[in-house]
Amino acid sequence: MGKRFIGALVMVSAVTLALGAGQYRLLAQQRAPQPAAAAPQRGAQPATATPQRGATAARPARIAGHPNFNGIWQALNSANWNLEAHSVTGLPSQFWQLGAIASIPAGKSVLKDGGTIPYKPEALKQRDENRAKWPDGDNEAKCYMLGIPRYTYHNIPFQISQGDVDIQMVYPFAAGNRFVHMRDKDHQTDPVDSWMGRSNGHWEGDDLVIVTTDLIADSRLDRAGNFHSNKLKVTERFRLIDSTHIQYEATLDDPETYTRPWTIAMPLYRLIDENAQAFEHKCVPFADMLLYHDLIGDKPKP
């Protein structure tokens, strides 16, 4: 069983590095002040501004009358480990050689009421079983797409591309892509469930509201075994606080799994360093042993 964790543990380290880099860029890096322009000489022609390499174009506050959500965004919390409040813990004792690398950071609940997920009794038993068997069954460990809302609070930053009408979100981990159907006034559904489901969006004032359905039941909400059925409906609300902060909320409604709808809430931070990018995370090679252990044997590839 220990060797089946190899792919997941490598991925945990990569995600931790990505989170640390994102925090450093967002919180520590400041732009250097620009020198004052020299006063023009009498009779001289007005100077023409020459774009410098790496210069950032002015960011419009609104696009087609709506707030500008364009940018690379990141949640800075431990929700991907566990949406509920959790103390510091670690992987099973057989991984003692990893030392503190195998520790899981503490975190507070991201539920809006600060409580716990309102599972039905049988669903709670399933959650506990999922937790005991982690990473088995976790789509993140298998390098599958994470689905909604997990991609939003995953440790790796994601990108929002907003046009006059259409909106797309790109998630580097497992090549996740999400097209938000802003033109669909009838809120159609997809004929087949999928990892990303179908996202229909609309504006409520300055809030971007996205309703996602048709999500596959095999997706997990975090690494703590929290889950949903294919009856889940996720209603997200993106509210731009200023040019670098989004207040994010997502309400999860799944009558097969939960006794009532419940809501998570957290801020998202825009990466402000010059030439910020969302780098592709090719995770498939790290999941080979976990997925195909029985076929390729116990010995990891060199």
Across the structure, where does each feature detected by a protein language model lie?
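PEST-like low-complexity, intrinsically disordered acidic/proline/serine-rich tracts
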Residues: 2-302
